C-alpha cells in the first residue's frame, strides 16, 4: 500500500512538473514572439520599395528592413543597369525559402537582386547597415557605390562565403540599397534574415547583446561539459558520457553564430 501511494505521489509530481514546464515554456516563447519579432517592430516599414525614415539623427530608431523590397529574379544587377528593363515584384524578407518565388516548378537556386530606397533627414550623417548571413555570395551597393562583398556572386566565378557583417556609410536626404545575390547549393538561398538599418551605435549595441548572450551560453556549456568529464572519471557512469555527448552537440550548435560573427566561412551542410 505504501509503495502504491509513493508511486501515485511520484506520478502526480511528474505530471505537475511537466505541466508547469509547458506553461513556463509557452510564456517564454510568447515573450520572445512579442519582444524579438523583427516583422512586428513599431518603426515604419517600407511600402512598395520605399521607406520614410524621418526624425532627428539623435532619436533615429533602428529599422528592421523586413517588408516590401523590390526583388528582381534571375538577375545579378549593378547600379549601371537600367532597372526599368527588368521584371520585379515586392517581397518580404523570408517570405520564400528560395529564389523561386513560390513556384515549385523552378529551381530555388540562381541569382536575384534586392533593392530598397530610404528617405532620410536632410543633414548628412553616418548610418549603418547590418546584414546577417546571406546565402551564399553577394555584392552590396549603396547609392551606386560597391561598399561590401561577401564571396563572389558572379555565376562564372562563384565563391560562396557567409558572415554576419556591418557596413557604415554617410548619406543624406535619400539612399538606395542594392544587394545582388547568388546561391547554388544552400538550404535557404538568398536573403532570409532581416537586415537592420540605423544609427551604427544602436545597431552595434544590439549585436553586442546577442554576442554576449551567445558567448555566455557557450562558456556555460563548456563548464558543464568539463564537469561531466570530471564526473565520469570519478564515477565511471555511462550517464555522464551520454550527458557529455549532449553537451558537445549543443556546443556545436551554440558556436555557429559566434563563428559567423568573426569569420567568413563556406556554407556548412
Put a short name on every predicted segment.
Residues 159-216:
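An acidic-aromatic loop/edge-strand motif
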Residues 86-94, 145-163:
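Solvent-exposed beta-strand/loop surfaces of large extracellular or lumenal domains
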Residues 198-206, 260-269:
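Membrane-interface interhelical loops and short amphipathic "cap" helices
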Residues 118-142, 177-179:
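Aromatic-lined ligand-binding clefts that engage carbohydrates, nucleic acids, or primary amines
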Residues 32-36, 215-231, 238-265:
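Hydrophobic alpha-helical transmembrane segments of multi-pass membrane proteins
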Residues 8-122:
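Extended carbohydrate-recognition surfaces in non-catalytic/accessory domains of CAZymes
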Residues 64, 111-117, 126-128, 164-166, ...:
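Intrinsic-disorder/low-complexity, polar/charged segments enriched in Ser/Thr/Lys/Arg/Asp/Glu/Gln
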Residues 1-7:
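Short, Lys/Arg-rich, polar N-terminal cytosolic tail immediately upstream
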